[in-house]
């Protein structure tokens, strides 16, 4: 099932070349449904907005939370049953699925927790 919609649990993530703690990832989930996104931490929505699929990837348009008013261009791909997203937190579309110090990139590999309802 290669639909981006559903509830996704991060299995691995890194920001600016540093791996995110597993304990943080275990409490986080990303929901993509009907053009809207929600990021939950411990079941509480901490960030939300809209998304649109583009010819080059996916763009998040934040409406509430730390990304309110921001446009975040991102790459995405499916690798087997995993969804990989590389977010351009600086507003620039990443050119590859990697991060390094000072780049303002967030890379996450997700597994599907639940399909879209």
Spans of model-derived segments:
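N-terminal helix-cap/turn-to-beta initiation motif at the start of protein domains
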Residues: 1-9
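Contiguous, well-ordered beta-strand patches that form the walls/edges
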Residues: 11-25, 33-98
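Short, solvent-exposed loop/turn segments at conserved positions within beta-propeller repeat blades
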Residues: 100-103
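Short beta-strand-to-coil "C-cap" segments at the C-terminal boundary of structured domains/repeats
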Residues: 109-117
């Amino acid at each position: 099932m290669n639909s981006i919609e559903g509830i996704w649990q991060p299995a691995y993530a890194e920001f600016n070349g540093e791996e995110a703690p597993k304990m943080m990832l275990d409490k986080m989930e990303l929901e993509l449904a009907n053009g809207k996104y929600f990021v939950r931490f411990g079941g509480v929505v901490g960030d939300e907005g809209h998304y649109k699929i583009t010819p080059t990837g996916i763009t998040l348009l934040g409406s509430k939370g730390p990304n309110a008013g921001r446009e975040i261009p991102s790459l995405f791909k499916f690798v087997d049953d995993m969804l990989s997203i590389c977010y351009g937190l600086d507003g620039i579309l990443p050119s590859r699925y990697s991060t390094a110090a000072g780049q303002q990139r967030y890379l996450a590999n997700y597994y599907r927790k639940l399909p879209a309802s």
